Amino acid sequence: MDPNTVSSFQDILMRMSKMQLGSSSGDLNGMITQFESLKLYRDSLGEAVMRMGDLHSLQNRNGKWREQLGQKFEEIRWLIEEVRHKLKITENSFEQITFMQALQLLFEVEQEIRTFSFQLI
């Protein structure tokens, strides 16, 4: 797992939490929850790849891991669209920077998850 990605997740989550305090927006809380869930999934998939014979363990533990993988890609696409929408409507430069970094992070994580999943197949 790339330490830069981990610190990027932490930075984005901290920034979004600060934005949430200054906003009454409930959908931002949902985005934060989705980011946290995505980070945990990415980390667990990365750990499975690190152990490399762990495919059978992963399949035994979760027989529907391919379905779950598809759902995670749908979540990523949803988050990308939400972040793009937020980026279009916000005029606050702090929020714009945060959403641009979040968007970049989502693209990186999507690529990492694709790479991990191809290694497991």
Curated annotation (Swiss-Prot):
Signal peptide: none annotated. Its main location: virion. GO terms for cellular component: host cell nucleus; virion component. A motif (Nuclear export signal) lies at residues 12-21, 85-94. Keywords: Host nucleus, Host-virus interaction, Transport, Virion. GO terms for biological process: exit of virus from host cell nucleus through nuclear pore. It comes from the Viruses. HAMAP family: INFV_NEP. Interacts with protein M1. May interact with host nucleoporin RAB/HRB and exportin XPO1/CRM1. Average number present in a viral particle is estimated to be 130-200 molecules. Belongs to the influenza viruses NEP family. This is Nuclear export protein. It comes from Influenza A virus (strain A/Chile/1/1983 H1N1). The lineage of its organism: Viruses, Riboviria, Orthornavirae, Negarnaviricota, Polyploviricotina. The gene is NS.
